[in-house]
Amino acid sequence: MIKKSVISLVSYDANRFLAKSIERYYEYVDEIVLGIDKDRVTWSGNPFEIDEEALWNELSNIDGDSKITIIEEDFHQSKVAIENDNYERNFLKGECSNDWVFSFDADEMLV
């Protein structure tokens, strides 16, 4: 059987969407790698805040099979937002242990 990984990004809209998004694909994948900027800064360099305690609790409740890994890294190294986007997605992809890697934004739902 082919094993599947998912990467997703934790940012300003994570409390609204991320857990719901993950719930839609959780049972179909073997690994979920989430990236969050260590300084809580967007790719454009703007600070953001989320309710981390609530989010981590929500993700913990979903993650009965221990599939979720959270990576904290400096994902705003460039002054060009799209370069930071590419860097983060490629970095997270490199952390995956499976050959099939899917990328879902927090506000994207698998139907």
Language-model features: where?
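Short alpha-helix within the catalytic core of nucleotide-sugar-dependent glycosyltransferases
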Residues: 19-23, 98, 111
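N-proximal low-complexity "stem/linker" segments adjacent to membrane-targeting elements
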Residues: 1-27, 34
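Active-site-proximal specificity loops/subdomain of glycosyltransferases
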Residues: 37-100
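Short, well-ordered alpha-helix to beta-strand connector turns
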Residues: 29, 96-99, 106
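Acidic beta-strand-to-loop metal/phosphate-binding motif
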Residues: 33-35, 103
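Short catalytic-loop micro-motif centered on adjacent basic/acidic residues
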Residues: 7-9, 102-106
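Acidic donor-binding/catalytic loop of UDP-sugar-dependent glycosyltransferases
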Residues: 90, 104-111
